[in-house]
Amino acid sequence: MRDSQTVNAPPKSPVAGGPPAISAPIMRLQTGTHHDPFEVLGVHAQADGTTVVRVFMPQAEAVEVAGGRMARVAGTDCFERVLAAGSALDVHPVLKWQDKRAGDWHQDRSPYTFAAQIGEVDLHLFGEGRHFQIWNVLGAQLRTIDGIAGC
């Protein structure tokens, strides 16, 4: 059995000058094992003043945000774009993406730019198996959040 440091360590590039290693959090997203996708996806301010926008879109060939193309993280279905410090960006930016199959362009917003909608009490009761109206919390609950209808 491997220790947790070995399991969570990012993979190394097998060949010098080969494709870059994929970070551990992005690899966990790709494999569906990340416990908190909000940690990686969405809009994140960086210490140097830049902003990173990151999405996971397995159905997309290409993705654009804030008027520019996002780069695919090699070997994954994650796309990201780093915006310069001081760049104007909507809190919930519109994503434009091209479908892999048909090539059609669509637009949407990333759900990971919105705050989590399940409260602590609901999570606690659900975890205990004592939430007797969980259908009011989970699933498709049509709402308007931050002025955006249909969230």
Please name every model-derived segment.
Residues 2-47, 73-151:
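The feature marks proteins involved in alpha-glucan
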Residues 64-66:
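Beta-strand signatures of extracellular beta-sandwich domains
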Residues 68-71:
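Beta-strand-rich interaction surfaces with strong enrichment in secreted/lumenal proteins
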Residues 56-62:
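Short proline/glycine-enriched turn/loop motifs at strand-loop junctions of beta-rich domains
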